[in-house]
Amino acid sequence: MAAPAKRARVSDASPLAAPCPVPRAAARVPLPLPAGPSGHEPESDAVAGFLRWCTRVGLELSPKVLVSRQGTVAGYGMVARESVQPGELLFAVPRSALLSPHTCSISDLLERERGALQSLSGWVPLLLALLHELQAPASPWSPYFALWPELGRLEHPMFWPEEERLRLLKGTGVPEAVEKDLVNIRSEYYSIVLPFMEAHSDLFSPTVRSLELYRQLVALVMAYSFQEPLEEEEDEKEPNSPLMVPAADILNHIANHNANLEYSAEYLRMVATQPILKGHEIFNTYGQMANWQLIHMYGFAEPYPNNTDDTADIQMVAVREAALQGTEDETERLLLCERWDFLCKQELVGEEGAFVIGREEVLTEEELATTLKVLCMPAEEFRDYKERAGWGEEETEDGSLAITNIPKLQESWKRLLRDSVLLTLQTYATDLKTEQDLLSNKEVYAKLSWREQQALQVRYGQKMILHRLLELTS
């Protein structure tokens, strides 16, 4: 289930604009308990029903764990009844209990129509399986659906009013990612999903033929589903399709997690990775996720400074703009554009790409180092470099773009990097001091809405990384 540690070098940051990324487990926010999209069920009844269902399907829960809303960071979670040691099994989910296109009641149909259901996201078969099972009164997964959050109250930014999304998340990269998601979801629904449901109207009631419900289920799959990793010898294959893993998606996330999902032929097992004290919550990981990714895909952010995987982006075009600002005449501008075009042809930069800066390192080190080098090198050196297309060129020394080594960079590199950071900071609606004032005043912070608090954590974490870069390049 772990996410890739680094983003693609040239990425549009949208999980639905390309083949399906690694989905993770669920983001948890305090929401009323539903029984799927059609009704409500008291919490104790829902948990009891789910536990009875676990027994029926052979999902084995350790007696040391408890499914509960009490003692969790948000919503449902899993808590240790007794102390747990590393390596202990927390629960085991038989593959027959997984909800996927291969296990649902219309699996044969989905397999026959597989060619017609292909999409950029790769999620359509699972989403159709969910749409069918949700409407079925006797669905084998009904007790599992009872633990889902209320679909109409998901907190992903795609459900925020556009004005609120822009106001709270401007500069973070989230509004742009959401807009791409919404365009792709709408296209996928009307071109593939709705025609399929209408062609099989006996299997899909009018109540589930809804773009809004489809959008909600996309958010659910984005947040709750898992994707089994390929074996090393299968690296050239297409990624595995996402699937729903009951019990595993109950666990909440923190960067310093204490459990991990393991895959085997018959079972998926959640195993403790570090000691868990009695009464403490059991946490899985969604991978190395920056706060902007967490809020985009799951609807929450980790409070500063807890997310050690947090990052800030410097748009590649911002570096180009900063370099252009340093030119003095048209000749210099044309020469700089020539260098940029060279970098584009080398696939090191792109119009929608970003340089990703972590707390301790530059995650896109090769791309940023080469870009700074090419844009700052003397004209004659660039001509030689271009003729060789970079072949045989000595690479930047290992670790030269570790955050602590940035002061050692050439002055021209530091100046360009600093100017790029300043341009990036201008894209936010507020400055760092405004965020610090909100965070330091507990009374004021407590009065903020959930969305305002989460967005503040995203903005603040990014700005702290960017301001540290300013200090190191001064």
Swiss-Prot record:
Catalytically driven reaction(s): L-lysyl-[protein] + S-adenosyl-L-methionine = N(6)-methyl-L-lysyl-[protein] + S-adenosyl-L-homocysteine + H(+); L-lysyl(8)-[histone H2AZ] + S-adenosyl-L-methionine = N(6)-methyl-L-lysyl(8)-[histone H2AZ] + S-adenosyl-L-homocysteine + H(+)
Record has Transmembrane as a keyword: no
Subcellular location: Nucleus
Residues given in the record as substrate binding sites: 123, 225, 227
GO BP, sorted A to Z: negative regulation of NF-kappaB transcription factor activity; peptidyl-lysine monomethylation; regulation of inflammatory response; stem cell differentiation; stem cell population maintenance
Listed GO CC annotations: nucleus
EC numbers: 2.1.1.-
Domain of life of the native organism: Eukaryota
Keywords, in A-Z order: Methylation, Methyltransferase, Nucleus, Phosphoprotein, S-adenosyl-L-methionine, Transferase
One Gene Ontology term of the molecular function aspect: NF-kappaB binding
Residue numbers of N6-methylated lysine PTMs: 64, 180, 373
Modification after translation, per record: Automethylated.
PROSITE patterns: SET
SUPFAM superfamilies: RuBisCo LSMT C-terminal, substrate-binding domain, SET domain
Sites of Phosphoserine modification: 14
Binding sites annotated in the UniProt record for S-adenosyl-L-methionine: 74-76, 224, 252-253, 298
Residue span, SET domain: 63-287
Keyword Magnesium: no
Record text on subunit structure and interactions: Monomer, homodimer and homotrimer; these structures are stabilized in the presence of S-adenosyl-L-methionine (SAM).
Function noted in UniProt: Protein-lysine N-methyltransferase. Monomethylates 'Lys-310' of the RELA subunit of NF-kappa-B complex, leading to down-regulation of NF-kappa-B transcription factor activity. Monomethylates 'Lys-8' of H2AZ (H2AZK8me1). Required for the maintenance of embryonic stem cell self-renewal. Methylates PAK4.
Family per similarity comment: Belongs to the class V-like SAM-binding methyltransferase superfamily. Histone-lysine methyltransferase family. SETD6 subfamily.
Name of the featured protein: N-lysine methyltransferase SETD6
Organism listed in the record: Rattus norvegicus
